[in-house]
Amino acid sequence: GDVYKRQICIGVGNEGEGRTHYSGQLISGNVLDAELAIGDYEPQISIQIWKRAMDNARIELIAPTGERLVISDRNAGVVHHNIKNMRIVSKAYGPGPFYMGEEIYAAMVATSGYITSGIWEIRFTVENVLDGFFNMWLPPVSTLSSATGFLRPSPEYTFTIPGTSRRAICVGANGRAPGSAATFSGRGVNVKSGLMLYAKPDITAVSYTHLTLPTTY
Protein backbone atom coordinates (compact mmCIF):
# COMPACT_ATOMS: atom_id res chain seq x y z
CA GLY A 1 0.00 0.00 0.00
CA ASP A 2 2.84 2.44 0.75
CA VAL A 3 4.49 1.83 -2.64
CA TYR A 4 1.73 1.08 -5.14
CA LYS A 5 -1.17 2.90 -3.42
CA ARG A 6 -3.14 -0.33 -3.48
CA GLN A 7 -4.31 -2.57 -0.68
CA ILE A 8 -5.41 -6.21 -0.69
CA CYS A 9 -8.45 -7.20 1.38
CA ILE A 10 -8.93 -10.85 2.34
CA GLY A 11 -11.83 -12.54 4.11
CA VAL A 12 -11.22 -14.46 7.33
CA GLY A 13 -13.18 -17.56 6.30
CA ASN A 14 -16.04 -19.35 8.07
CA GLU A 15 -14.25 -21.52 10.62
CA GLY A 16 -15.17 -19.52 13.75
CA GLU A 17 -17.67 -22.02 15.14
CA GLY A 18 -16.44 -25.11 13.32
CA ARG A 19 -14.65 -26.89 16.22
CA THR A 20 -11.61 -27.24 13.98
CA HIS A 21 -9.08 -25.45 16.22
CA TYR A 22 -7.66 -26.21 19.66
CA SER A 23 -5.29 -23.97 21.60
CA GLY A 24 -3.50 -24.73 24.84
CA GLN A 25 -0.36 -24.36 26.91
CA LEU A 26 1.99 -27.17 27.87
CA ILE A 27 3.55 -27.18 31.34
CA SER A 28 6.85 -28.91 32.11
CA GLY A 29 6.35 -32.32 33.70
CA ASN A 30 2.58 -32.40 33.10
CA VAL A 31 0.28 -34.40 30.84
CA LEU A 32 -2.34 -32.67 28.69
CA ASP A 33 -5.18 -34.50 26.92
CA ALA A 34 -7.11 -32.90 24.05
CA GLU A 35 -10.29 -34.76 23.10
CA LEU A 36 -11.30 -35.09 19.47
CA ALA A 37 -14.68 -36.46 18.40
CA ILE A 38 -14.69 -38.23 15.04
CA GLY A 39 -18.12 -38.78 13.56
CA ASP A 40 -19.36 -41.61 11.40
CA TYR A 41 -18.42 -41.95 7.74
CA GLU A 42 -15.09 -40.09 7.84
CA PRO A 43 -12.80 -41.76 5.25
CA GLN A 44 -9.78 -39.69 6.29
CA ILE A 45 -8.77 -36.79 8.49
CA SER A 46 -5.57 -34.88 9.18
CA ILE A 47 -4.33 -33.07 12.29
CA GLN A 48 -1.79 -30.25 12.24
CA ILE A 49 -0.02 -29.46 15.51
CA TRP A 50 2.11 -26.31 15.76
CA LYS A 51 4.37 -25.66 18.75
CA ARG A 52 7.73 -24.22 19.67
CA ALA A 53 10.55 -26.45 18.46
CA MET A 54 12.25 -26.10 21.86
CA ASP A 55 9.17 -27.35 23.71
CA ASN A 56 9.75 -31.09 24.19
CA ALA A 57 6.76 -33.40 24.49
CA ARG A 58 5.84 -36.94 23.51
CA ILE A 59 2.59 -36.87 21.51
CA GLU A 60 0.27 -39.86 21.30
CA LEU A 61 -3.06 -40.63 19.65
CA ILE A 62 -5.32 -42.74 21.86
CA ALA A 63 -8.08 -44.51 19.93
CA PRO A 64 -11.61 -45.04 21.30
CA THR A 65 -10.67 -48.73 21.56
CA GLY A 66 -7.68 -47.93 23.78
CA GLU A 67 -4.73 -48.33 21.38
CA ARG A 68 -1.97 -45.78 22.05
CA LEU A 69 0.01 -44.63 19.03
CA VAL A 70 3.07 -42.37 19.27
CA ILE A 71 2.89 -39.75 16.51
CA SER A 72 5.80 -37.56 17.63
CA ASP A 73 8.79 -38.08 19.86
CA ARG A 74 12.19 -36.46 20.02
CA ASN A 75 13.79 -38.97 17.63
CA ALA A 76 10.69 -40.35 15.92
CA GLY A 77 11.09 -39.01 12.33
CA VAL A 78 8.36 -40.39 10.07
CA VAL A 79 6.01 -42.64 12.05
CA HIS A 80 3.74 -45.32 10.55
CA HIS A 81 0.95 -47.19 12.36
CA ASN A 82 -1.61 -49.72 11.15
CA ILE A 83 -4.60 -50.55 13.33
CA LYS A 84 -7.67 -52.46 12.17
CA ASN A 85 -8.80 -50.82 8.93
CA MET A 86 -6.72 -47.65 9.35
CA ARG A 87 -3.28 -46.32 8.45
CA ILE A 88 -1.80 -43.42 10.43
CA VAL A 89 1.30 -41.58 9.21
CA SER A 90 2.91 -38.63 10.99
CA LYS A 91 5.98 -36.46 10.48
CA ALA A 92 7.52 -33.43 12.17
CA TYR A 93 8.66 -30.42 10.11
CA GLY A 94 10.90 -27.52 11.15
CA PRO A 95 12.34 -25.41 12.53
CA GLY A 96 13.82 -23.30 9.74
CA PRO A 97 16.18 -20.34 9.40
CA PHE A 98 13.38 -17.78 9.77
CA TYR A 99 10.87 -19.64 11.93
CA MET A 100 11.46 -21.44 15.22
CA GLY A 101 8.16 -23.30 15.23
CA GLU A 102 7.59 -26.99 14.57
CA GLU A 103 4.70 -28.63 12.76
CA ILE A 104 3.61 -32.20 13.45
CA TYR A 105 1.34 -33.44 10.68
CA ALA A 106 -0.67 -36.63 11.25
CA ALA A 107 -2.87 -38.24 8.59
CA MET A 108 -5.48 -40.86 9.50
CA VAL A 109 -6.71 -42.80 6.47
CA ALA A 110 -9.17 -45.68 6.34
CA THR A 111 -7.82 -48.54 4.21
CA SER A 112 -11.37 -49.91 3.99
CA GLY A 113 -14.63 -48.41 5.16
CA TYR A 114 -14.24 -45.44 7.49
CA ILE A 115 -12.08 -44.20 10.36
CA THR A 116 -13.08 -45.54 13.77
CA SER A 117 -15.65 -43.09 15.13
CA GLY A 118 -15.83 -41.99 18.75
CA ILE A 119 -13.71 -39.94 21.14
CA TRP A 120 -10.00 -39.92 20.35
CA GLU A 121 -7.44 -38.33 22.66
CA ILE A 122 -4.31 -36.44 21.67
CA ARG A 123 -1.99 -36.78 24.66
CA PHE A 124 1.01 -34.55 25.32
CA THR A 125 3.45 -35.96 27.88
CA VAL A 126 5.58 -32.89 28.52
CA GLU A 127 9.28 -32.91 29.36
CA ASN A 128 10.36 -29.25 29.39
CA VAL A 129 9.08 -26.13 27.66
CA LEU A 130 9.99 -22.49 27.07
CA ASP A 131 6.49 -20.99 26.82
CA GLY A 132 4.38 -24.07 26.03
CA PHE A 133 1.83 -22.46 23.70
CA PHE A 134 0.58 -24.74 20.95
CA ASN A 135 -2.23 -24.91 18.40
CA MET A 136 -3.95 -27.74 16.54
CA TRP A 137 -6.06 -27.56 13.41
CA LEU A 138 -8.34 -29.97 11.56
CA PRO A 139 -9.31 -29.65 7.88
CA PRO A 140 -11.96 -27.02 6.97
CA VAL A 141 -15.38 -27.56 8.53
CA SER A 142 -16.95 -27.88 5.08
CA THR A 143 -15.03 -31.14 4.53
CA LEU A 144 -15.97 -32.77 7.86
CA SER A 145 -18.99 -34.45 9.38
CA SER A 146 -20.96 -32.18 11.71
CA ALA A 147 -20.11 -34.61 14.52
CA THR A 148 -16.35 -34.24 14.01
CA GLY A 149 -14.38 -31.67 15.99
CA PHE A 150 -12.51 -30.87 19.19
CA LEU A 151 -14.63 -31.12 22.33
CA ARG A 152 -13.03 -27.95 23.74
CA PRO A 153 -12.41 -25.86 20.63
CA SER A 154 -10.98 -22.35 20.56
CA PRO A 155 -12.46 -19.77 18.15
CA GLU A 156 -9.14 -17.90 18.07
CA TYR A 157 -6.72 -18.58 15.19
CA THR A 158 -9.59 -19.72 12.98
CA PHE A 159 -8.99 -17.17 10.21
CA THR A 160 -7.69 -18.85 7.10
CA ILE A 161 -4.83 -18.46 4.63
CA PRO A 162 -4.17 -16.02 2.93
CA GLY A 163 -5.83 -13.86 5.61
CA THR A 164 -2.88 -14.64 7.87
CA SER A 165 -0.71 -12.26 5.82
CA ARG A 166 0.63 -9.49 8.04
CA ARG A 167 0.33 -6.67 5.48
CA ALA A 168 -3.03 -7.52 3.89
CA ILE A 169 -6.27 -6.15 5.35
CA CYS A 170 -8.10 -9.10 6.91
CA VAL A 171 -11.91 -8.66 6.93
CA GLY A 172 -14.24 -10.33 9.42
CA ALA A 173 -18.05 -10.46 9.56
CA ASN A 174 -20.34 -8.43 11.83
CA GLY A 175 -23.08 -10.19 13.78
CA ARG A 176 -26.76 -9.27 13.90
CA ALA A 177 -26.39 -7.27 17.12
CA PRO A 178 -24.52 -3.93 16.98
CA GLY A 179 -20.86 -4.32 17.89
CA SER A 180 -20.93 -8.12 17.72
CA ALA A 181 -19.07 -10.56 15.49
CA ALA A 182 -20.76 -13.28 13.46
CA THR A 183 -20.25 -16.62 15.19
CA PHE A 184 -19.16 -18.29 11.95
CA SER A 185 -16.57 -15.62 11.16
CA GLY A 186 -12.95 -16.71 11.50
CA ARG A 187 -10.94 -14.93 14.19
CA GLY A 188 -7.38 -14.09 15.00
CA VAL A 189 -6.15 -12.85 18.36
CA ASN A 190 -5.91 -9.50 20.10
CA VAL A 191 -3.15 -10.34 22.59
CA LYS A 192 0.22 -12.03 22.40
CA SER A 193 -0.60 -15.72 22.31
CA GLY A 194 1.50 -18.58 21.05
CA LEU A 195 3.39 -17.96 17.83
CA MET A 196 1.47 -14.92 16.58
CA LEU A 197 2.16 -11.36 17.71
CA TYR A 198 -0.40 -9.32 15.75
CA ALA A 199 -4.16 -8.90 15.86
CA LYS A 200 -6.59 -10.08 13.18
CA PRO A 201 -9.07 -9.32 11.66
CA ASP A 202 -8.24 -5.71 10.90
CA ILE A 203 -11.82 -4.64 10.08
CA THR A 204 -15.29 -6.17 9.93
CA ALA A 205 -18.09 -5.80 7.39
CA VAL A 206 -21.85 -6.35 7.30
CA SER A 207 -22.79 -10.02 6.88
CA TYR A 208 -26.54 -10.16 7.62
CA THR A 209 -29.64 -8.57 6.06
CA HIS A 210 -27.89 -6.53 3.40
CA LEU A 211 -28.83 -5.99 -0.23
CA THR A 212 -26.59 -6.93 -3.14
CA LEU A 213 -26.64 -5.80 -6.75
CA PRO A 214 -28.15 -8.16 -9.33
CA THR A 215 -25.81 -10.01 -11.66
CA THR A 216 -27.75 -8.87 -14.76
CA TYR A 217 -29.22 -5.52 -15.69
Language model: regions and residue ranges:
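Extracellular S/T/G-rich loop segment that most often corresponds to the catalytic His/Ser-adjacent loop
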Residues: 7, 18-107, 112-116, 124-125, ...
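Short, surface-exposed beta-strand/strand-loop-strand elements in extracellular ectodomains
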Residues: 61, 135-138
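Glycine-rich, aromatic-lined ligand/substrate-binding cores of catalytic
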Residues: 123-125, 139-143
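Short acidic/polar inter-strand loop motif in beta-rich domains
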Residues: 126-135
